[in-house]
Every structure is written in C-alpha cells, then in structure tokens.
Curated annotation (Swiss-Prot):
The keyword Transmembrane does not apply. Keywords: Chloroplast, Plastid, Ribonucleoprotein, Ribosomal protein, RNA-binding, rRNA-binding. CDD domains: Ribosomal_uL14. It comes from the Eukaryota. Part of the 50S ribosomal subunit. This is Large ribosomal subunit protein uL14c. GO terms for cellular component: chloroplast; cytosolic large ribosomal subunit. InterPro entries: Ribosomal_uL14, Ribosomal_uL14_bac-type, Ribosomal_uL14_CS, Ribosomal_uL14_sf. Belongs to the universal ribosomal protein uL14 family. Its main location: plastid. PROSITE patterns: RIBOSOMAL_L14. Disulfide bonds: none annotated. Binds to 23S rRNA.
Length: 122
C-alpha cells in the first residue's frame, strides 16, 4: 500500500534512485496505491549525468509492495521493498532495463512492456 509521502526504490535504469509519492491517480478519493497503480512522484535521489534529476516530477507504476497482495486463487505475495518503474505519458517505461522481480498483476493491467523487461515475474 503506497500513500502520499511514501519513499519508493526505483526498479529501472532511468536515472532516479528514490521516489516520493505525492499523488495516487485513479479517482478523487483514492488514497493508496497497490501493485499496478500509477502514481505521481518526485525524484528524491538521482544518479549523476542522467536524464532524471532530483526534484523532477514523474509518473511511475508500482511494481513491488512490502504489504503484498492476495490473488484470486488465495495465494499471498509480498516483497522486501516498495518499488516503482518510471513511465512516460504513453505508459511505456523510460528506462531500458528493469531490476528485480515484478508481480504478475502488471500483465493484467496492460504493462506488458515492463513485464517483458523484468528478469523474473512472480
């Protein structure tokens, strides 16, 4: 569960290292984001000499949450950290690589490009 002011790791090579969620998209009263939801975030830590700089506002999709999600078959999946992938206006990733595992729920949410770049889909 990602709420505003939550710090997330970045799971791609877009140049950002840490993001802070400032808004959860998807309705005027939606307060928390789960895996596959789009958020507006601010870059809090960045790699030098890369396109994304500190204090840039970006769109990102949540790919891992520490709280986890329960699937329809009853299994429960939980990750070690909260992580997101930076995306552009067309919902394509801005980086060319994705690090770490991602959840299978991204495929249902039409983020197939992120799923294909990921080394492991759980």
């Amino acid at each position: 569960m990602i709420r505003p002011q939550t710090i997330l790791n970045v799971a791609d090579n877009s140049g950002a290292k840490k993001l802070m969620c400032i808004r959860v998209l998807g309705g005027s009263y939606k307060q928390s984001a789960n895996i596959g939801d789009i958020i507006i975030a601010v870059v809090k830590q960045a790699t030098p000499n890369m396109p994304l700089k500190k204090s840039d506002k970006v769109r990102a999709v949540v790919v891992r949450t520490a709280q986890g999600v329960q699937r329809e078959n009853g299994t429960f999946i939980r990750f070690d950290d909260n992580a997101a992938v930076v995306i552009n206006k067309d919902d394509n990733p801005r980086g060319t690589r994705v690090f770490g595992p991602v959840a299978r729920e991204l495929r249902d949410r039409k983020f197939t490009k992120i799923v294909s770049l990921a080394p492991e889909v759980l």
